Amino acid sequence: MQVKRWFLNNSLRNYQYLLYDENYAIVIDPLKADIFDEFIKQNTLKLEAILITHRHGDHIAGVKKLLEIYPDALVYAYADNELFKPNIYVADGDFVDFGFTSCKVMYTPGHIDDHVCFLFEKEKALFCGDTLFNAGVGGVHAASADVNQLYDSVVKISSLDGDIKPYPAHDYWQSNLDFALSILPNDESFNYYRNQVAELAAEHKPVVNLAEESKLNIFIRSISDKSLLQALPEYRLGREMFVKLRKLKNNF
């Protein structure tokens, strides 16, 4: 299985993902149906499934059009939304077998209450939607958002094998690292990656594994990294530090 990534260059800086082999394809969180349709047709693939991490519009807007073109594709999601009902409802710990590959469902609320991630263990790929970003985490602005649930979800993801690569739904590399450097301006990892991505177009930015992400993500580091106590000594590591950082990032 291969992962195809597109950057949409829209105001939300969305990434779009498609998994495929020589015969089949799986779409993740389609915003723009046309790019998927073009690739599927060019490579003579069969669209087997559409996986939805959560119900925000920039993750589901392309579903209806894809289903018009590929009516046999099955939609997997945690809950209903305003545009469609999924064919298959998923829950935490579910194992989904597509025949040519499979994934495990991880319930990861916090950004919104219906959020799930899809872990393809064989491919070492985690499609994490808006829960985890490179160097950051999802916002907590939705009505059903909960920063404590987001913390628990990030802890869950951070406990996965370090060689698994997270594929987030947005490119927020620079802004997240700028925020991290506002807290720890001399941090080696933050400075290294900020320099690495500064001149790269979004479509060329790296896909790092969780072992690397744990070094460059201040929110993952807030779980246990004592260096944060130097910058924010009045907060305890773990949930308290994470919540404080999320509040600071809201106003950054």
UniProtKB/Swiss-Prot annotation:
It is an enzyme of class 3 (hydrolase). Pfam families: HAGH_C, Lactamase_B. Zn(2+) 2 binds at residues 58-59, 130, 170. Gene3D superfamilies: Ribonuclease Z/Hydroxyacylglutathione hydrolase-like. The keyword Translocase does not apply. SUPFAM superfamilies: Metallo-hydrolase/oxidoreductase. Binds 2 Zn(2+) ions per subunit. It catalyses: an S-(2-hydroxyacyl)glutathione + H2O = a 2-hydroxy carboxylate + glutathione + H(+). Its EC number is 3.1.2.6. GO terms for molecular function: hydroxyacylglutathione hydrolase activity; metal ion binding. Keywords: Hydrolase, Metal-binding, Zinc. Its cofactor is Zn(2+). The keyword Hydrolase applies. Pathway: Secondary metabolite metabolism; methylglyoxal degradation; (R)-lactate from methylglyoxal: step 2/2. SMART domains: Lactamase_B. Thiolesterase that catalyzes the hydrolysis of S-D-lactoyl-glutathione to form glutathione and D-lactic acid. Belongs to the metallo-beta-lactamase superfamily. Glyoxalase II family. This is Hydroxyacylglutathione hydrolase. It comes from Francisella philomiragia subsp. philomiragia (strain ATCC 25017 / CCUG 19701 / FSC 153 / O#319-036).
